[in-house]
Swiss-Prot record:
<keyword id="KW-0560">Oxidoreductase</keyword>
<dbReference type="GO" id="GO:0099618">
    <property type="term" value="F:UDP-glucuronate dehydrogenase activity"/>
</dbReference>
<dbReference type="GO" id="GO:0099619">
    <property type="term" value="F:UDP-4-amino-4-deoxy-L-arabinose formyltransferase activity"/>
</dbReference>
<feature type="binding site">
    <location>
        <position position="460"/>
    </location>
    <ligand>
        <name>UDP-alpha-D-glucuronate</name>
    </ligand>
</feature>
<feature type="binding site">
    <location>
        <position position="492"/>
    </location>
    <ligand>
        <name>UDP-alpha-D-glucuronate</name>
    </ligand>
</feature>
<keyword id="KW-0441">Lipid A biosynthesis</keyword>
<feature type="binding site">
    <location>
        <position position="613"/>
    </location>
    <ligand>
        <name>UDP-alpha-D-glucuronate</name>
    </ligand>
</feature>
<feature type="region of interest" description="Dehydrogenase ArnADH">
    <location>
        <begin position="314"/>
        <end position="660"/>
    </location>
</feature>
<dbReference type="GO" id="GO:0032991">
    <property type="term" value="C:protein-containing complex"/>
</dbReference>
<dbReference type="InterPro" id="IPR005793">
    <property type="entry name" value="Formyl_trans_C"/>
</dbReference>
<feature type="binding site">
    <location>
        <position position="393"/>
    </location>
    <ligand>
        <name>UDP-alpha-D-glucuronate</name>
    </ligand>
</feature>
<feature type="active site" description="Proton donor; for formyltransferase activity">
    <location>
        <position position="104"/>
    </location>
</feature>
<comment type="similarity">
    <text>In the N-terminal section; belongs to the Fmt family. UDP-L-Ara4N formyltransferase subfamily.</text>
</comment>
<feature type="binding site">
    <location>
        <position position="347"/>
    </location>
    <ligand>
        <name>NAD(+)</name>
    </ligand>
</feature>
<dbReference type="InterPro" id="IPR036291">
    <property type="entry name" value="NAD(P)-bd_dom_sf"/>
</dbReference>
<feature type="binding site">
    <location>
        <begin position="368"/>
        <end position="369"/>
    </location>
    <ligand>
        <name>NAD(+)</name>
    </ligand>
</feature>
<protein>
    <recommendedName>
        <fullName>Bifunctional polymyxin resistance protein ArnA</fullName>
        <ecNumber>2.1.2.13</ecNumber>
        <ecNumber>1.1.1.305</ecNumber>
    </recommendedName>
</protein>
Amino acid sequence: MKTVVFAYHDMGCLGIEALLAAGYEISAIFTHTDNPGEKAFYGSVARLAAERGIPVYAPDNVNHPLWVERIAQLSPDVIFSFYYRHLIYDEILQLAPAGAFNLHGSLLPKYRGRAPLNWVLVNGETETGVTLHRMVKRADAGAIVAQLRIAIAPDDIAITLHHKLCHAARQLLEQTLPAIKHGNILEIAQRENEATCFGRRTPDDSFLEWHKPASVLHNMVRAVADPWPGAFSYVGNQKFTVWSSRVHPHASKAQPGSVISVAPLLIACGDGALEIVTGQAGDGITMQGSQLAQTLGLVQGSRLNSQPACTARRRTRVLILGVNGFIGNHLTERLLREDHYEVYGLDIGSDAISRFLNHPHFHFVEGDISIHSEWIEYHVKKCDVVLPLVAIATPIEYTRNPLRVFELDFEENLRIIRYCVKYRKRIIFPSTSEVYGMCSDKYFDEDHSNLIVGPVNKPRWIYSVSKQLLDRVIWAYGEKEGLQFTLFRPFNWMGPRLDNLNAARIGSSRAITQLILNLVEGSPIKLIDGGKQKRCFTDIRDGIEALYRIIENAGNRCDGEIINIGNPENEASIEELGEMLLASFEKHPLRHHFPPFAGFRVVESSSYYGKGYQDVEHRKPSIRNAHRCLDWEPKIDMQETIDETLDFFLRTVDLTDKPS
């Protein structure tokens, strides 16, 4: 049986050996080049392949059409993946008639994603295992073919658990590979309601937060002990690594992070105390705890900190252009809720952010981005993170003012992007679900879906292509000049302060605000082309939480990523949105102040939006990148969002002239 193998690490080596022992013919092996910044304690797949006389490759992008074609020419019967670090696209998986199978180091559906070995230790699990599962488009989600459980002992650390997993993997493959070869396997679908997903870990994720319980910190030490980079802390600005530890149920009133004693080296935690058994100061040598205390100059009562003292006091500076807009003002509120952000904002108005103007960590200037270029360049240079949220994003303007849309949405934003490149600043750029255009995929996927728009004589697409071209420019700057970026694509976010009723009066608003205006004024709700177009509506609170996590960027997992932020469960047509809104309106305590409902009216899109408009029938996001990078999923039901949005706008209406 011919196979193509994707493999890396010790698991890759043992997987290859198991395939050969089971009589598989390996046509080619795809692996990775070693990362010079990573301690290579594991076997080399490339070396093993060379010794076995098997062609081996390490392309940067195995999913490139050229590599897909080369793999197709190998005509594999089956494909195997053993700890290959990149997602293998469906175009490759479909090449093998018998399917594709992946070896994963956890008891799926638990601990999907990256670094399950480390995560189970971080989380204090007592059991894990290995799973062989069928590969599908979604990572680690295919049916389970075989699974083997192993116990995690209290004294297990990352390397001992790694050895246990390797031993279990050998057993599992020896038992299962012959069955796959003969087409005699039983597959069990994963239970999605039990699934958990974790992202990649970096060395910076392993800092010791002393306010946490000692048991939690001890688990962190176990999870990243040598040969992993190690858990760490600071004495002032001096970094040190903790290689091994013990939990002490020490009842102390000392502040977390305080040194209780130096021999043994005991540190007060949020609950109990942690004994540092062995550690290392800076890039020095490993030593036992009391010697480490002496080297670091620690005495009883000394304080440790989770980050260097010189950086602990500095807040992250976030520049929000368009801070008074729907996303900008809600994001400002979320950032100021924390104590480690300083927000700088620019906009042409301040009505939505007036509640922040006296906040000590909020700095606002009223101005236009097309005029205040010097202020913007200075603040891009000054700040750490830049969010250029200024854009014309209302559909009627795409046909009414296409050149103004291009000038503001593309030209002005391109200038800001170039400032970020010039000063090497991180940019979080608001792409849009509009870039997918008339894509026919069931779920719009950031990495696979085609971006399809209409002909040039349909100016409705100028917003979509302006945003798409900026996405491509940012991506190119990231590839060629090292720009640190994340692109996020909101899918129909809605909530309080989405546009305003005055904007709706001239047609320059999003759907729900326009519908609320119709109810307030007693005018018919207009259903464009029947209102059958479906959208996935996302509560602003869910959207902002995802955006906040992008800004936090735990483990740098968001760098270079495109992330859809939407709620695929909240799919409804515009007609259904109108009906839900009407039902909420009729039950509202202020209902008697407003005119009778004037009904629904079907109108043609050309009469409403003007010549050159095209609509999209459906727009449903894949949110796998949001799961993977942010550990995020939307939680708020569409009805709750409708109720709160309606209530907000009704309470902004001057009721003095309304009937009672």
